[in-house]
Amino acid sequence: PTSPAASPRRGDGPPHGAPSPDLDRRANYGIRRVEVQPGNIGYIDLRQFADFEFGKPDQPARKAIEAALDLVAGTDALIIDLRNNGGGSPAMVGYLSSAFTPKGADIYNTFHYRQGTASEAPADWYAKPRLQTPLYLLVSARTGSAAEAFAYTLKNAKRAVIVGEASAGAANPGGQVDAGNGFGVFVSSGSPLSPITHTNWEGDGVQPDVAATPATAPNVAKALALETVLKQTQPANAALDSRWALEALRAETTPPKPVAFGDYVGSYGALVIGQDGTSLYLQRGRRPAALLTSLGDDLFTLTGEPGTRIHFERDPKGAVSAFETRGSDGSSSHYRRGG
């Protein structure tokens, strides 16, 4: 016999049962943040695998994850952040996995219970799977249960690179049983098995392909994504944008040698280069100042906006006399000091 759905697992949902529809809505169905990061890298911060029923395409959780995927559909690579995801619904595990794998692929875990089995393979398949997009999953010791199932499935299907540390190791479904005197005991009701590994991640967790601390994992994954994208064939401007994003990321994480900011401070026509403590910034009139990150050799990038660079020019005596702004789209402007 086959049970209709996999049971909740350790780490799935709040301690007193499944979230209410209103709590799910307020939590945006686990989707904390979706954005396109520098270098055209997609990023989804997913905190929960929200539940929904197959056969009902208008259910809010399903529409929410589809909207998130649509927002990053044009990106060159995608990072899904599971570092703070404790789990959730097997239905979402299967559906989201199908967004990156071929329809009907034999990759999904099957849960074995005393009363039967249940597969995480989705009853409805994602309509527009991205089969070639480089995919990176961030995991930590907080990553549990359904989030681990998702990472385990895509790792063993060789469809995603796992970045971070070993996950929680909570594979087996079950629940708390009253042991009396105010004590409870977790009792497993079954166990998942992968058709690829013929085992699961219970106790050991999902092991990373690339080790990183929870704090450094996002930048490690971004660098891996940009390096992969740069190996692919791209239009010239897109390749330049990716390369500048990677160089800026490296500069922000491993700053170059100390820079004499005083050399650059001053007015350049309508623009001002100023110094605030150990930071250099660019400002036009009353507009918010933009911080600059040094790339070395009189070259800077706008912090957080690596598609714009500033190159300072020096006169024959070595004094800074002007700067040029350059865009990865080919645009440029020139500003003389005091002009």
Regions found by a protein language model. Name each.
Residues 199-202, 206-245:
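Low-complexity, Gly/Ser/Thr/Pro-rich intrinsically disordered linker/tail segments
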Residues 28, 32-62:
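STAS-typified acidic loop motif
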Residues 54-76:
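A short, well-ordered alpha-helical element
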Residues 44, 80, 135, 154, ...:
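Terminal peptide-recognition signature
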Residues 1-41, 241:
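Extended, small/polar residue-biased N-terminal targeting/export presequences
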Residues 44-45, 74-86:
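Short acidic catalytic loops
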Residues 234-339:
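Peripheral terminal and inter-domain segments
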